[in-house]
């Protein structure tokens, strides 16, 4: 098992986990978990305006598939102007049909004024970055679309707060 995402240091570990996934979790067990999760989302979102946050990462790809199965087809991706062009192209080629992209505008000029954000080596700096970009953009989307629920792909195994049941 991989454990915390931050502790996986190379891509080979991810590839190995994928190549041997059925040794860890069977297709039958995975299908059962997906079915249960879809049911839970439907119950919690019934009659509420909901969307999901999509980052184009591994966790959000799974979240998107599950949300779509639960009937939630609106999503948001928050980015800035510091993304690699290849990543932006990948997003355009693979984004969900109901995706809205919010650009919070941080660019090279912004980075020159905030050099401590270039390679944040402390968790509080990384958290500050997520607040500046992700959280503000998600809050804007939530408010503009008058949502009641925004589903996020967070993992307990990584120590993330996942809300109350």
Predicted regions and their residues:
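ATP-dependent adenylation/nucleotidyltransferase module used to activate substrates
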Residues: 1-165
């Amino acid at each position: 098992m991989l454990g915390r995402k931050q502790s996986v240091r190379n891509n080979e570990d991810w590839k190995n986990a994928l190549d041997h996934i059925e040794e860890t979790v069977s297709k039958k067990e995975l299908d059962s978990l997906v079915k249960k999760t879809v049911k839970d989302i439907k119950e919690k979102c019934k009659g509420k305006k909901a969307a999901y946050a999509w980052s184009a990462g591994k966790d959000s790809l799974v979240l998107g598939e599950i949300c779509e199965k639960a009937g939630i087809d609106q999503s948001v991706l928050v980015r800035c102007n510091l993304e690699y062009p290849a990543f932006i192209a990948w997003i355009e080629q693979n984004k969900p049909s109901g995706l809205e992209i919010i650009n919070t505008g941080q660019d090279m000029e912004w980075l020159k004024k905030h050099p401590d954000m270039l390679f944040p080596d402390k968790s509080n700096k990384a958290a500050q970055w997520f607040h500046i970009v992700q959280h503000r953009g998600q809050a804007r989307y939530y408010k503009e679309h008058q949502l009641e629920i925004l589903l996020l792909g967070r993992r307990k195994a990584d120590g993330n707060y996942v809300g109350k049941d």
